């Protein structure tokens, strides 16, 4: 079929949420003429649920996005109202940053960034169809009948695909925050042959700040110590005038109200059909599943400096409006609170992610990429990370360059994508530190060391950032080398000082680096014995040095595991492999292989239901028959 296109682009991104913004900024910065199409310009990078960025594992993803040259970290550093490092009492592998956002300012700042970006056109329009010829994308069709040509299309529609809002017995077609739903595009994706799933998520009510009795709650302040998501942000710019959050709890009265109205709860009455998030359940679900718990935490989170809206984190619900009011008034500090918005549930279509490659391109259609909640994830950070990778790979495909695949040992983003494309997901997927087997090398403090060079190679890291990174890396390397070369000897003067500080004396000579491996010896103590570095070191470099030195043995073990797995990751499986021709593999393994069509032995080994014997048989088969190369 011959199409008459009115406009021509290299890449078209459908949807301007957190995934779409990162995808379109990446493609345009890599030199591709890009269209970012959105149903509503006023909802670009909008936060329809929680007014925060980061958190456990998620905060590390934001640092990874920043290291690769993405935008989320820089944007939240300009628009936060509170910053807090989580898990400071635990090991470095699980520490992560979390920021309360001024949600309207966050969206405004991101919109400004998109509007001034070269090669990027921003358009309010609804895309109804993705145009495909001979198995590859050629463009899109708008609801107004316009046809735009494209060499690649990235679908980042969030919860808008056949979205339906549910509040008590009320159910109506809608995207998030009462925006338009994308119904025709949902039909089109199904017609193209993609398998579609149905998920559900929800949001809590918002209450008026001036109607809260804060004396009945516990204050939750931000950190005084400067921290940032972007490696380019300066400590001097750290916000001193932060806004606190507040902690309160449900109680037995709250639980009674919910239990007495379960028959009116869409979750239990059969109105809700979609699968909800395991790690962010509704309050009614929590009360039923954890009936033995006397109370549940609720955090009162301001939505910005210039609004009275307060987000009641932990109270996600789709109960009827009158029940929500009673529930709020049963909670300490909220007895007289004014509900400004009701909570609601939203059901939406997703593209089942086992149909994707690790580049986030669909296996079925060349040039069609999907990212974010469209792939079954939850969270702004997970969406942004996928959007960045999908955008990068869309640009690389258009330019005829090698694709970018982040491995599980490279980044949490790599862990997430591998989980999605290898295991799929039966519920909204959330990143957790426990999902990463190499989490000690995927830390908050070393994301730039892991990923900045990759960002530079693909063209997203500019000269200013690259120069700053090179200075930091050289300072780190030089100081590590110095500490490993200077020796402390067990002489009287040294041991007298060691004992004065309350530490065990030295029995043998050791390097300053070995001295720092002692749990009680920090960098400042070590250099008090051996002298300071040739130049003043930033606190972040010192933190990195301490972690790398104190956990060196564990880090080395993790890197050894990575090296072993690398051999399996490099063993490719031909795209044209005949799974039925492999004798002796288990029926379940054969079925899973056919469904997922893994690209490497490493990926095949991580598929649920596949055992080591199946992998051994597969490797023997490939050594004898696997001569073909995978092509897309």
UniProtKB/Swiss-Prot annotation:
GO terms for cellular component: cytosol. GO terms for biological process: tRNA methylation; tRNA wobble uridine modification. It comes from the Bacteria. FAD binds at residues 15-20, 127, 182, 373. Its main location: cytoplasm. Its cofactor is FAD. Coiled coil: none annotated. Pfam families: GIDA (PF01134), GIDA_C_1st (PF21680), SAM_GIDA_C (PF13932). The keyword NAD applies. It is found in: Cytoplasm. NAD(+) binds at residues 276-290. PROSITE patterns: GIDA_1, GIDA_2. One of its GO terms (molecular function) is flavin adenine dinucleotide binding. The keyword Cell division does not apply. Keywords: Cytoplasm, FAD, Flavoprotein, NAD, tRNA processing. NAD-binding protein involved in the addition of a carboxymethylaminomethyl (cmnm) group at the wobble position (U34) of certain tRNAs, forming tRNA-cmnm(5)s(2)U34. This is tRNA uridine 5-carboxymethylaminomethyl modification enzyme MnmG. It comes from Streptococcus pyogenes serotype M4 (strain MGAS10750). The lineage of its organism: Bacteria, Bacillati, Bacillota, Bacilli, Lactobacillales.
């Amino acid at each position: 079929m011959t199409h008459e296109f009115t406009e021509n682009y290299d890449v078209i991104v459908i949807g301007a949420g957190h995934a779409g913004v990162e995808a379109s900024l990446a493609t345009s910065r890599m030199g591709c003429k890009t269209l970012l199409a959105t149903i509503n310009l006023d909802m670009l990078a909008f936060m329809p649920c929680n007014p925060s960025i980061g958190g456990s594992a998620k905060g590390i993803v934001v640092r990874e996005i920043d290291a690769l040259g993405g935008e989320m970290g820089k944007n939240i550093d300009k628009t936060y109202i509170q910053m807090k490092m989580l898990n400071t009492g635990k090991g470095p592998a699980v520490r992560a940053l979390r920021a309360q956002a001024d949600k309207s300012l966050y969206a405004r700042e991101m919109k400004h960034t998109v509007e001034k970006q070269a090669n990027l056109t921003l358009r309010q329009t609804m895309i109804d169809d993705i145009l495909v010829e001979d198995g590859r994308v050629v463009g899109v069709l708008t609801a107004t009948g316009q046809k735009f040509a494209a060499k690649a299309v990235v679908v980042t529609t969030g919860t808008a695909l056949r979205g339906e809002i549910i509040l008590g017995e009320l159910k109506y077609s809608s995207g998030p925050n009462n925006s338009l739903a994308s119904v025709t595009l949902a039909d089109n994706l199904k017609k193209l042959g993609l398998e579609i799933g149905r998920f559900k998520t929800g949001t809590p009510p918002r209450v008026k700040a001036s109607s809260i009795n804060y004396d009945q709650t516990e204050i939750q302040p931000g950190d005084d110590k400067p921290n940032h998501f972007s490696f380019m942000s300066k400590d001097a710019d750290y916000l001193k005038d932060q806004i606190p959050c507040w902690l309160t709890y449900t109680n037995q009265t709250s639980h009674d109200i919910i239990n007495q109205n379960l028959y009116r709860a869409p979750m239990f009455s059969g109105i809700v059909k979609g699968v909800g998030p395991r790690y962010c359940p509704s309050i009614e679900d929590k009360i039923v599943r954890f009936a033995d718990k006397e109370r549940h935490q609720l955090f009162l989170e301001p939505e910005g400096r210039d609004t009275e809206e307060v987000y009641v984190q932990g109270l996600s619900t789709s109960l009827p409006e009158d029940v929500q009011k009673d529930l709020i008034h049963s909670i300490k500090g909220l007895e007289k609170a004014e509900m400004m918005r009701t909570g609601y549930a939203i059901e939406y279509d997703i593209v089942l992610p086992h149909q994707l490659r690790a580049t986030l391109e669909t296996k079925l259609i060349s040039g069609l990429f999907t990212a974010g909640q469209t792939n079954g994830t939850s969270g702004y950070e997970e969406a942004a990370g996928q959007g960045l990778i999908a955008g990068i790979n869309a640009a690389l495909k258009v330019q005829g360059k090698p694709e970018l695949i982040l491995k599980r040992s490279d980044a949490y983003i790599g862990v997430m994508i591998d989980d999605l494309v290898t295991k799929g997901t039966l519920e909204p997927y959330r990143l957790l530190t426990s999902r990463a087997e190499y989490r000690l090398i995927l830390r908050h403090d070393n994301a730039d060391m892991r990923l900045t060079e990759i960002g530079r190679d693909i063209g997203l890291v500019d000269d200013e950032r690259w120069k700053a990174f090179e200075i930091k890396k050289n300072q780190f390397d030089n100081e590590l080398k110095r500490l490993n070369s200077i020796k402390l000897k067990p002489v009287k003067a040294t041991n007298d000082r060691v004992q004065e500080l309350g530490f065990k004396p030295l029995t043998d000579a050791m390097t300053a680096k070995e001295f720092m491996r002692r749990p009680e010896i920090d960098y400042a103590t070590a250099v008090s014995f051996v002298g300071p570095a040739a130049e003043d070191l930033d606190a972040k470099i010192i933190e990195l040095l301490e972690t790398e030195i104190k956990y060196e043995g564990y880090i080395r073990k993790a890197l050894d595991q990575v090296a072993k797995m690398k051999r399996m990751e490099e063993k490719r499986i031909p795209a044209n492999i005949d799974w039925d021709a492999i004798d002796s593999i288990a029926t379940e393994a054969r079925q899973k292989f056919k469904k997922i069509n893994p690209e490497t032995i490493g990926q095949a080994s991580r598929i649920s239901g596949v055992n080591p014997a199946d992998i051994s048989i597969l490797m023997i088969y490939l050594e004898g028959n696997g001569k073909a190369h995978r092509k897309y």
